[in-house]
A protein has these predicted regions:
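Short beta-strand-plus-loop segments that form exposed binding edges in beta-rich domains
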Residues: 3, 13-25
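Active-site-adjacent substrate-binding region
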Residues: 152-183
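Active-site-adjacent mobile loop/cap segments within catalytic or ligand-binding domains
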Residues: 11, 20, 31-39, 98, ...
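Non-catalytic propeptide/linker segments at domain boundaries
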Residues: 15, 29-46, 50
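Pro/Thr/Ser/Gly-rich low-complexity, intrinsically disordered linker/stalk tracts
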Residues: 233-267
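Active-site microenvironments of hydrolase-like enzyme catalytic domains
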Residues: 54-155, 159, 183-206
């Protein structure tokens, strides 16, 4: 990619290495990479020529060092199916051996949930917002997850995320954002994970009303923060804990002389 920095030396146009640590030693960098790099997994004798973030999960899983069965369950004969399934298999391998996935061999990372963020297809003839759909799976493995939790925990996760998204988008943009539905369906990304999981179909990439916001960086920030708040709420509810949402820094800060002598008035949003 292309990474533009402001001209000259400033606080934003630099890479900083710090050796601030309790341990003695020297920190050095032989190279610095911005972004995820270019795809380097060859299929059919050549690489894609695309940045890695535009490639599928199957190729990332191989590059990340996942075991062969994780990224190539179809033995290299069906990359599309491997791409879909590798997402869940990575979660299971990473969490294997943890309290949330005790029977499966893996790296023991205690992942508590998984969320796949998608965009969906579909259009509205009335140019209305298609909106957000949540998907989960309960009819698998006798209704239980690997740690013994009821699979309806995935429904709770889906519901909390959809509710928070609808609330935050409406609050920030005064838009009646559509909450489409909650589907209990047989999808790989919600069936295979050993932990509670959901697919969030955020918006329709085919529908103009949705895409008016889809590429707005402010909208993306709102969505990202909304999902963070929803996951925080879900996890704390699971553990019976109170939670505090990380506050945002103030914006539109200004200072003006106050109405009384020798006073200043500070304001912000």
């Amino acid at each position: 990619g292309t990474f533009a920095f402001d001209k000259g030396k400033n606080d934003y146009g630099m890479v900083v290495l710090s050796n601030e640590s309790k341990e003695k030693g020297v920190v050095c960098a032989d190279a610095v990479r911005f972004g995820g790099g270019m795809g380097n997994i060859a299929r059919g004798g050549e690489t894609s020529g695309l940045p890695r973030y535009l490639e599928g999960s199957r190729y990332f899983a191989q590059w990340a060092g996942m075991p062969y069965p994780v990224y190539s369950g179809r033995e290299g004969k069906d990359d599309m199916s491997d791409d879909i399934n590798s997402r869940s298999k990575m979660i299971n391998y990473l969490s294997g051996g943890s309290i949330f996935n005790p029977e499966e061999q893996g790296l023991g990372v205690p992942f508590e949930m998984a969320m796949a963020l998608h965009s969906d297809a579909g259009t509205s003839k009335e140019d209305k917002i298609v909106g957000t759909l949540g998907i989960y799976t309960t009819k698998f493995n006798k209704g239980l997850l690997a740690g013994g939790t009821n699979r309806y925990a995935s429904r709770d996760l889906s519901d909390i995320i959809l509710t928070q998204l609808q609330r935050d988008i409406h609050s920030n943009y005064a838009i009646d954002w559509t909450r489409r539905s909650l589907w209990d369906r047989n999808y790989s990304e919600t069936r295979l994970p050993a932990v509670p999981s959901t697919i969030i179909e955020l918006l329709s990439h085919q529908n103009f009303a949705d895409m008016r916001l889809g590429h707005d960086p402010n909208f993306k920030f709102t969505v990202g923060r909304s999902i963070y708040k929803a996951i925080l709420q879900y996890l704390c509810n699971q553990h019976g804990k109170d939670y505090v949402v990380q506050p945002l820094p103030v914006s539109n800060f200004s200072i003006r002389f106050g109405d009384k002598k020798n006073t200043l008035e500070l304001s912000w949003k």
